[in-house]
Amino acid sequence: MLVLGLETSCDETGVALYDSRRGLLADALFSQIDLHRIYGGVVPELASRDHVKRMLPLLRQVLDESGCRTGDIDGIAYTAGPGLVGALLVGASCAQALALAWGVPALGVHHMEGHLLAPMLEEQPPQFPFVALLVSGGHTQLVRVDGIGRYQVLGESLDDAAGEAFDKTAKLLGLGYPGGPEIARLAQDGRPGRFVFPRPMTDRPGLEFSFSGLKTFALNTWQHCRASGDDGEQSRRDIALAFQQAVVETLIIKCRRALKQTGLKRLVIAGGVSANQALRSALERMLGELDGQVFYARPRFCTDNGAMIAYAGCQRLLAGQRDGPAIQVHARWPMETLPAL
């Protein structure tokens, strides 16, 4: 089955073609970072308009790169949520229109299921069951995964997601957007030990997360530096390092607990923050100590992309799932409500 995947949940327009026998044939992506950078964050209306502008050129690009024709496509998968409603509607309406014109089925895909399954596109994909750490700008969750659609949320953030905390901390330090890569860049030259941030909710049982306090701690630290006249670039680097260390160590502690609780030794990390090299290195060390395995997608499939949507949609289309005639998207969508395959 050849599936066209469309991703428009936020500020990236992604289009890909995935074949159930041959694998990923082509993928194309347009990032709106430059469009939103001057505003310090995503402007939903601008995001929606740009998705409209980019969709068909990207579709032509993947068809040209793959050598496929529209008549070869057997189904269309698109991100139906969670995400920005206006942006989601662009992808959903495009998918439904093309499906009607081409006489093929369409299916809305859960954005975070796409992220969770992105490592399946690699040469050595994980085997079920495993624990997944989904860590992005909008989500931080630990999930037990026994199969596609067989998800048990073990713990999640009670306030800011990890990626959101990265972006907000970068903004208060006067750094660019998106904040995650900026924090990671500065942290490389930070001095260990100058600042020590708390590891939130690690002093009690459970697998929940809370990152809003870290953002406040960073703000107070930065304000103290400014008040004392020590607000130069080195202080920014030191705060960035202390913040990143706190987030990474918090995630490591919770992942270790989740693996112990489930008795599993396979961990999948997915979502935009999974591209953070400090986090990857720390997880690899931890899984080495536990004689376990860690899996993640290549960096370009950590952030939003059409390939993960095409893959996830292909699995569900092969199982016979189809959309009805109505276009439905979801700003919020609990992953546990998805049907199991």
Swiss-Prot record:
Its cofactor is Fe(2+). Fe cation binds at H111, H115, D304. It is found in: Cytoplasm. One of its GO terms (cellular component) is cytoplasm. It holds the Pfam family TsaD. Disulfide bonds: none annotated. Belongs to the KAE1 / TsaD family. This is tRNA N6-adenosine threonylcarbamoyltransferase. The lineage of its organism: Bacteria, Pseudomonadati, Pseudomonadota, Gammaproteobacteria, Pseudomonadales.
